[in-house]
Amino acid sequence: MVSIRLPDGSVRQYEHPVTVAEVAASIGPGLAKAALGGKIDGELVDTSALIDHDVALAIVTEKDADGLDIIRHSTAHLLAYAVKDLYPEAQVTIGPVIDNGFYYDFAYNRPFTPEDLEKIEKRMQELAKKDEPVSRRVVSRDEAVDYFKSIGEKYKAEIIESIPATDDIKLYSHGGFTDLCRGPHVPSTGKLKVFKLMKVAGAYWRGDSKNEQLQRIYGTAWTKKEDQEAYLHMLEEAEKRDHRKLGKQLDLFHMQDESPGMVFWHPRGWTLWQQVEQYMRRRVNDAGYLEIKTPMIMDRSLWEASGHWQNYRENMFTTESEKRDYAIKPMNCPGHVQVFNHGLRSYRDLPLRYAEFGSCHRNESSGALHGLMRVRGFVQDDAHIFCTEDQFISESIAFNTLAMSVYKDFGFDNVEIKLSLRPDARAGTDETWDRAEQGLREALTACGVTWEELPGEGAFYGPKVEYHIKDALGRSWQCGTLQLDMVLPERLGAEYVAEDNSRRRPIMLHRAIVGSMERFLGILIEHHAGAMPAWLAPMQVVVMNIAESQAEYAQSLAQSLQKQGVRVEADLRNEKISYKIREHTLEKVPYLLVVGDKEREAQTVAVRARGGVDLGVMPPDTFIERLRQDVQSFN
């Protein structure tokens, strides 16, 4: 007798072992048709999985997140099947599920073209309509290696050869195609109805630039056509908002091959940067942080002591001078510990909060670079809090409150918080980790926020809180972090004199709110589609004259606004006013002031707000007051 407990708490009993598909069929024909897989005691399995002992079972359908993952994984295999069917010489490698879709890497003797993608997608649709059953078999490692070598799939054979000889290998087949996979997969290809191939990109075998270059075909797959259409529409919107395009259109920044991963900021872009930096400086100053500045280049010995040289060396830029090795800092924390160590610290000095807009450099691979979002040179709104164990909960509460307030000011109201917990390989005792994790939970609870816990995702030196902001398109970006560190203070000899005159290690909290300034500006540009709120806009106002006779008045008006702290310019060119308005509208300037003879004589201005909104004619002082209210409204 096999007893199976379902999610609603009911128990079904069977006289003999049954498959997930048979359980679904016994519940009802609708569920049998909808079943894509199952969850046996929390483990995702195929519908063909045999149940021979008492378990808890959930039937997975397209309504479940796991169901969508199964569909995407199976669609990746369908892609490989179609490619092999159309281009038998192509070799298959790997094809995982990613956010919103999947990809598959191929080795082929010529580049795939857009026409090839159309042909492949059409073939996928034909194969899906055949509704071929998907079967699984388990073989030994050596048998699997021999099979893939016999059909000329050297990459698959190489993957399997790296697996321990005692491990069983799962092979999935449908039609004339067999692939290595952990599964699970849909019961038949007919379940794959909504998908689209997106693009081809380059990739390296096993992600190593020293290996052969492959071709990566990206695709997306969904359970409903309307979901896919919504996703494709979001991509169109994202394309319009691409910070690289807007950076060029709005003359904010550029990047060039002579300095890969580094940003050339133009005047308006640097003005935007300064607004963000100055805002952040005000906030951390008000929160009791002390701003410091640490060297960009430091001796190898310091990086060895911190552990970065051993664990992060390949991502560090290094140099040599007078027979000494140096590294350009990839992060600011070791330098902050040096400031803390400079002098004897007492428990009365704590907490000490050091902030730095620290310039860091990391040797990211050129293929990973992406506009402002992934760079080699960046500035962090970095800070480190040195405190006692009794203080770290209150410091965590204060940081969370500050971070959430900052995100709101920048226009991000949807923030997801994640708590990364202890990994298997870690420093410190279980008791220490218990206190650290529970302390962060207490801090988040005190702030009245909800969070998701991620077991095993913490760093080896401590648990971490992550802040993921959602932009106008619903995309999630991790920006802020609060990382408890139980290792670096010991490695670098940080200590303070406790109340009982003993020497103790401080708790060290690494924290950032916006993270990389470059990346955050990229997110801001895309979130606001380049139309920054008035307080952030690099150019808040443009004053335009209709004819030469109003040029002097327009110029004096711009100068008056500038003296009052407004970021303004006067456009006195001998162009039609409609041309000027259109040009500055495309520049997404919040306010356009137009002056003609009537405005000059009455000492007024005609005001147009962004979006073509006519606010009418008003005295300059009235406009200034309106602008001030607009600027202050973000608070």
From Swiss-Prot:
Needed co-factor(s): Zn(2+)
Alphabetical UniProt keywords: Aminoacyl-tRNA synthetase, ATP-binding, Cytoplasm, Ligase, Metal-binding, Nucleotide-binding, Protein biosynthesis, RNA-binding, tRNA-binding, Zinc
GO molecular function: ATP binding; metal ion binding; threonine-tRNA ligase activity; tRNA binding
Name of the protein in its database record: Threonine--tRNA ligase
Pfam families, sorted: HGTP_anticodon, TGS, tRNA-synt_2b, tRNA_SAD
Subcellular compartments: Cytoplasm
Broad class of enzyme this protein falls into: ligase
Enzyme Commission numbers on file: 6.1.1.3
Source organism per UniProt: Paraburkholderia phytofirmans (strain DSM 17436 / LMG 22146 / PsJN)
Domain of life: Bacteria
GO cellular component terms listed in the entry, alphabetical order: cytosol
Record's cofactor remark: Binds 1 zinc ion per subunit.
